[in-house]
Amino acid sequence: MKATTLALTALTLTSSACASTYTVRQEVSPTVTEIPVVKYDPTWKCPNCSPEEQYVLAELQEHTKISDRNALATIMGNIKQESKFIPNICEGGARVSYDNCYSGGYGLIQWTSIGRYNNLGKFCTKYGCDPSSLEGQTRYMINESTFQRYLPMFEGSGQTVRQYMVPAFYWLGWGIKGNREIYSYDYVKKIVWS
């Protein structure tokens, strides 16, 4: 009897183990969020430059076809010689608004002739910018007819800073060369492609 009970118990346990129900799990695929691919276009940057220098460098590349480091460095070196990137500077060093500079040059490139000086004001009146600001002067500088006349000489490539100084001279008409070429070569070292 013991053997029959033991066999019956073993059979019952085996049957109940086989009779267990199994649940089938369905795999749920995770929600896929598509990330748009943004094309990165490298440009010349100057990480160790002032915010004003960085702004002008970016705007020159954004609104012209200048891609040569030496050309950009030459323009930057000339601006540094003229104004140290201080937009509201009157020749001699006074920091004044556009309307309060009564003699000499004014602004980023020291607009000196009455025509060029007045055209800065007219441009900013027409396009809603401040002629005393970095942004307004940079816009005017890039669009000014004198700069536009010599722009193709900067948009070429492969010249030295010294060679780019020729169109820079005609663009600015400086009286004193000063350190503009030294500043330009300094920018050549500081400007990086990234």
Predicted regions and their residues:
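Residues that form generic nucleotide/phosphate-binding pockets
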Residues: 59, 144, 191
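Short, functionally critical alpha-helical segments immediately adjacent to catalytic or ligand/cofactor-binding
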Residues: 69-86
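Active-site or metal-binding loop neighborhoods of secreted/extracellular toxin and effector enzymes
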Residues: 156-194
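Peptidoglycan-targeting cell-wall enzymes and recognition modules
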Residues: 32-56, 81-157
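Short amphipathic alpha-helical segments that mediate assembly, nucleic-acid/protein binding
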Residues: 4-5, 53, 69, 147, ...
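Structural helix-adjacent loops and short alpha-helical linkers that scaffold large soluble proteins
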Residues: 65-67
